[in-house]
Amino acid sequence: MEDFVRQCFNPMIVELAEKAMKEYGEDPKIETNKFAAICTHLEVCFMYSDFHFIDERGESIIVESGDPNALLKHRFEIMEGRDRTMAWTVVNSICNTTGVEKPKFLPDLYDYKENRFIEIGVTRREVHIYYLEKANKIKSEKTHIHIFSFTGEEMATKADYTLDEESRARIKTRLFTIRQEMASRGLWDSFVSPKEAKRQLKKDLKSQELCAGLPTKVSHRTSPALKTLEPMWMDSSRTAALRASFLKCQKK
């Protein structure tokens, strides 16, 4: 699993995941499933914010390329991936500036358009079960929850999915591809619980149908918001590999 993670994810994401685990005294070489889960969660958070800006009129827009001097503000502030001290500093700054209630737990993102913190979840189980666990832990109506699964399912607070359908489909496609690549290496069953692995086998046909319904359009350009990170999903060689894997999935 460790080799898979280092091959599958952008080195910057791998480095951030390693730092996060070491901060809690965990070893990526031993707790490899957690290592993979953290990398996946980081990538989803970055993909969630990618391309989304607020223009000078306060409107939310999607920009893949354009005038670098345009008066655009990133729609999302990312806390996930920062060390805890810096992340809380960002949260406190947002709360002081906007008047939004400070969350009890460290959130993943802040949405400047909707003026709310967002908790992102990526689950190997049923989305509604994981959603309820998150909601029970957070115990705050102020923090928006958005859960994704590896089978293309999602669930969000009050069915408000924040992003446009194409942006969410890009995330779902990536998660499904990660699952397919794990399965091809015999790693998927160990990534989920034994009970869940059996249930997932029964859902294979349904999952393939979901895969066939997802868009294949993938941008080769790097978002201005993430040029310093150069995320894996915008890397041309990896994008080509993802598309090839995805098209193969469609033909099954």
Swiss-Prot record:
Function of the molecule: Plays a major role in the shutoff of the host protein expression by cleaving mRNAs probably via an endonuclease activity. This host shutoff allows the virus to escape from the host antiviral response. Hijacks host RNA splicing machinery to selectively target host RNAs containing introns for destruction. This may explain the preferential degradation of RNAs that have undergone co- or post-transcriptional processing.
Annotated active site: 80, 108
Organism of provenance: Influenza A virus (strain A/Pintail/Alberta/119/1979 H4N6)
Record-marked site positions (Important for efficient shutoff activity and nuclear localization): 195, 198-199
Name of the gene: PA
Record protein name field: Protein PA-X
Family membership noted in the UniProt record: Belongs to the influenza viruses PA-X family.
Protein location: Host cytoplasm; Host nucleus
Keywords, alphabetical: Decay of host mRNAs by virus, Eukaryotic host gene expression shutoff by virus, Host cytoplasm, Host gene expression shutoff by virus, Host mRNA suppression by virus, Host nucleus, Host-virus interaction
Biological processes, Gene Ontology terms: viral RNA genome replication; viral translational frameshifting
GO MF assignments: RNA binding
Any Pfam family matching the protein: Flu_PA
Annotated site residue numbers, Important for efficient shutoff activity: 202-203, 206
Domain notes: The probable endonuclease active site in the N-terminus and the basic amino acid cluster in the C-terminus are important for the shutoff activity. The C-terminus acts as a nuclear localization signal. The C-terminus is recruited to host protein complexes involved in nuclear Pol II RNA processing.
Keyword Thylakoid on entry: no
